[in-house]
Amino acid sequence: MYQNVYFDGRSIHLWDDKLGYRKTPYKRYAYLYDKGGKFTALDGTRLKKVFRYDKEDENLYESDVIATTRTLVDQYTDSDEPSVGHRTMIFDIEVEVTEGFPSPSKAENKITAIALWDSVTDEYYCYILDPENKLEIESENRVLKKGNNTIIGFKSEIEMLNAFLGKYCEIRPTIITGWNTDNFDIPYLYNRVYQLLGQEFAGLLSPIGVVKYSEYRQRFEIAGVSSLDYLALYKKFTPSLKPSYRLDAVGEDEVGIKKVSYEGTLNELYENDRKKFVAYNLNDVHIVVELDKKLDYIETSRGICHIGHVSYEDIYASSRYLEGAILVYCKKIDVVVPNKNKDARKLMAQRAREDKFAGAYVQEPQKGRHEWVFDLDITSMYPSVIRSLNISPETKIGKVVGWDSKEFIKKDNKKTYTIEVGGKDKGKLTESELKEYFEKTNVSISSNGILYRMDKVGLIPAILGKWSDDRVQFRKLAKQFNDDGNEKKFQYFNRRQYLQKILLNSLYGVLGLPVFRFYDIDNAEATTLTGQELIKFSKKITNHYYNKELGTDEDYVIYIDTDSIFASATPLVKARHKGIDTNAEVIMTQHILNIANEIQNYLNQSYDLFAKRFLNLDKHYFEIKQEVIAKSSLFITKKRYGMKIINEDGRKVNKTLVKGLDTVRSSFAKGMKTLLSEVLEDLLANVPKEQIDKRIFKFKKGMKAMDYDDIASPTGVKRLGKFIKNVDERNFQVMDKNIGGKLITTYYMKASPVHVKASLAYNDMIEYYGKKKYPKIVGGEKIKWVYLKQNPLSLAVLAYKGNEDPPEILQYIKEYIDVDKLYNQALKKKIKMFYDAMGYGLPVDERYTLQRFF
């Protein structure tokens, strides 16, 4: 199986785990219509294979498959097993900072250290520029070995780079990674080596001497070596936004390892404590090593890419690996697929400007606290819709314009329907004629009126079916080997089932992506709108179940989100078991499990009716399952709620599930998140409002004594330069104070976001204090910011980075932070959302009420 693939414009360079390295001329080919051709297109057209063709010919098939994917699909059609024999190198470089953050493209500053880890030997190395021998290494060759750490000091940077390249060529990694390596370490290292040692030495990073900047990927491409930046992988596979993506924060959060702490700048650490500097460099690598041991993102990425038959760097583009997987499937069944839409890029830009296609249905919740809530989730709803309706490019027949299924089934419906095929009017049918068409023709109809033939399984449904079946099989095998105690095989099959899950949940999302080969906005909306109708139908049937038993006419569904409905079992439990103690957790849980199971079965039986009446289907894949029971829940608004879960998938648990609340949001201050979490727990536990008010005002009173870092607002900086104005332009604000003969001035537009103002103020203060050795804040960074009280520089807000900040700026924040404004602008509004949902008034400080006298 392939380890790496590279296309140089003429030849394919392929690294195979058994056959080694091969270079072969690339022969492009495509398919064209030929009445007697031996190949068949997805739409049934007969085709012939051609090696010479006009790239602009609109009748071509598969002419636009990229060379690397074409090669991998053709050579490895029968296998999607990940290759073996890989050697991963995790590395990190440290660079001297003179003025501002070092530019990777210019690479003007010295590299002071390079640390690396070799996956085969489990050895760590640190190559450090140490001309004065401050490390006090006594051996003649300046090598110090401690356990699996080897530290080597050098008198010059050129010496150090030569030695590192020697070790790199000795290791000859197939995969390299680190934290932000694509944007900093790799380009800086390559450009620095190029400047000091020349092209030949810089090319040593590649086994064939080819390192080029890829405009498509916006980073360097090293032929024969896969660069998988762990920061990028972490962002791709971690579902929730993090308050900070700094290695320090992620390391502490995920594996309990922080960066080595130091005072001042990294330059000062290098000059004053070189041993600690080495520890800092090695520790950065160690954190990434431990992250991958826990998260396994490199193997996950490789597994996905092998299923898709694409290079590992394509892991970030789901449309690439999904398309590759479909191409492999089609090749196995001897089907040729069409070219992509030539206007895909224009459509992508247009989509970015306009609203996206219809998405999921989310119902505004019945706000407030609800007891004994259970959920019911439709299993793999979108894949199930696609498979049930047979949604695929080649199965799409046409469209019923203005289709409304509820209107269609009404007895007095006299509407005439227009039928479109290929966007053209093909005639009109009365309601009775359309009914007759449905009865006599094996077609389905989606909620947006798209007609699909059902006589043959479509390409997309067939692939989803295969992936679903594969996942079921892998899960069975994983369980079997886990029960047998075979850890190695359990891990293998558990990963394989996880990969299938990723593919299943990704495919429907790219149907509405113009760059996807099988893009069709009708098919995308057929999926989402039918999903909407299905979940709304589920609500209607659930309410029917409640109202029939209780003799009422009420809405018992508290909330709907995409494929899930939430309802309280309390009304049914109380009606069936008069006088029951609803605080009796064990008894209540059993009653609720029984009720949820009843409604689950009732809904699953009703889906036959839904499929036939609304979609013209005799069979379907719709199924709903109960997952969690919450003793109490608090619903605030759409996508924002908290639940005290006591049962999950039939197992007893005790945890708080939070969705969308500021207790888990990355842009909310750490200390304030803690308070909000406590308030949420109190509300879920039905703690009296007076006690919660006490907690809130105790926190407010204590804010002045808190560390500013706990109450500062974290955020990412975007488009910083966009808001800066020249002094002679209109519509700007000026903060201008001449203090001690120095001038601090920031010009920004009135509409500037508060974090931009805070960042610009920080950058000006670096100039003001003459601290040019500290890098300024730039776009893309994560920062924290605070409001300030009246201060000598008249700054309203001020930011800081959280690492390598001038002590003068941090002291300024400590002295002038406005905790009252932070409370009022940030925390008070969030608490009000909670209290509004409960029907409470604002928190009351009992110290200022008459109640304290009684």
Where do the language-model regions lie?
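Proline-aspartate-enriched helix->loop->beta-strand connector
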Residues: 164-188
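Common nucleic-acid-contacting/processivity interface regions adjacent to the catalytic cores
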Residues: 268-406, 411, 486-541, 559, ...
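C-terminal, non-catalytic extensions of nucleic-acid polymerases
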Residues: 596-854
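DnaQ-like (DEDDh/DEDDy) 3′-5′ exonuclease domain used for proofreading
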Residues: 1-172, 283, 287-310, 315-362, ...
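Conserved catalytic palm subdomain of right-hand nucleotidyl-transferase polymerases, strongest
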Residues: 91, 228-229, 368-381, 468-474
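Active-site-proximal helix-loop-helix substrate-binding element of RNase H-like nuclease domains
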Residues: 124-126, 133-138, 146-151, 172, ...
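Active-site palm subdomain of RNA-directed nucleic acid polymerases
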Residues: 259, 535-562
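Catalytic palm subdomain of template-directed nucleic-acid polymerases
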Residues: 565-598
